[in-house]
Amino acid sequence: MNLRSSLACTSSDIARWGLRSVLKRQGGVLPGRIAMKIDPYLLSDLASLVDRSVVITGTNGKTTTSNLIADAVAASGATVVCNRAGNNMEPGVVGALLEARSGLKRAGGGKRVGVFECDELYTVRVLPKLKPTHFVLLNLFRDQLDRYGEIDHTQEVIAHALELSPATTLIYNADDPLCASIAARVPNASIAFGIDGATNTESDRISDSRFCSQCNAPLEYDYVQYGQLGAYHCPSCGWARPALVRRVTNVKLSRDGYGFDLVFGSDSSAPAAHIDTRYNGLYMVYNVAAAFFAAHELGVDTAHLQPTLDAYVPAGGRMGRWDIAGRTVEANLAKNPVGFDRQIQSIKTAGGRLCAFFLNDNSADGHDVSWIYDVDFERIADTPGLVAFAGGTRAHDMQVRLKYAGIDAAIISDVAQAIGAVADEAA
């Protein structure tokens, strides 16, 4: 490292110490941001701290997938650095590496792995500097239009990021035509994964891309999993879902959650692993599959996969589950129509009768909340005995949307009121 890089590292350490010791705060992205003010190219130097690395991006599932990869790699005996808190812009990646650099240096070469969640629009800043060995592309849906714009802009950014890191292997969800079209246009080596066969779940009314990326003709589907995900082909030019190199098969939903097989090859003789989850959302099948296919590419033995999932603790706001007054209470996070529709489907599958919907418009959430009119709340409107609440900074907007869906929702001020309603209902 040169003098500027050393000064940036020292300044970051001082900032982190001050935030934690004096202000009693975790620090977040501030240490990384301070370091980058001094040395904007610091990430290029820090990249040498790890022997292999993977960057994970996509509209939904980044935090879950990256944390599962990190857990699986750690279980295999490697030293792992991961931005687990979801600080997924360049300062967050820099901050994670700075905080872990002493441990990475002690670990020595060969077993140091970086696992980094990255915001879609920041991939073009992170990939050229980090030059990860692998890049996982989960899905692309409409998300925060006031910041992201249209999906084709996000596609352009991700494709350009990959072009600037040509040695990076792309691991992508081939069931999503938006992801497959990126893979088709970049020079990177790629690994296509997806669900091999129909799961016969209830598909959404939302579709972000059912048009061919090559000729713009409408795509035809042999089956749809949800959103635009499924087995597609273009009747006009012949473009179709790529052959799956990594496959998810035998997907079954039980009372306990989804179970499925991961097949690490394209033929019947390929190694496989059976996975049982405690989640009833099909989106988690994709997240777990992406995580474990990536972990396998990083050298993780299949024997570590199920124990990793069994021990997994979701990040704050995601898939939290508690027992309150004899009732199972689940909390989840959705930031776009398809993600929200997946939660609606989970509510319907689980038979949930008391629902509290909190809608916020903070900068991190996006100020444009019109997307809630694309969420299929009508799907649960006929639930017998349904009790609904609306909260958050845009509680009244949520209440109106629910009213249009035929759902009467009372306004509540905080989560405590919702928990109180659970206790009252159980009494």
Question: Which residues does each PLM region occupy?
Answer:
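Phosphate-binding loop of NTP-binding sites
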Residues: 3-194, 201-211
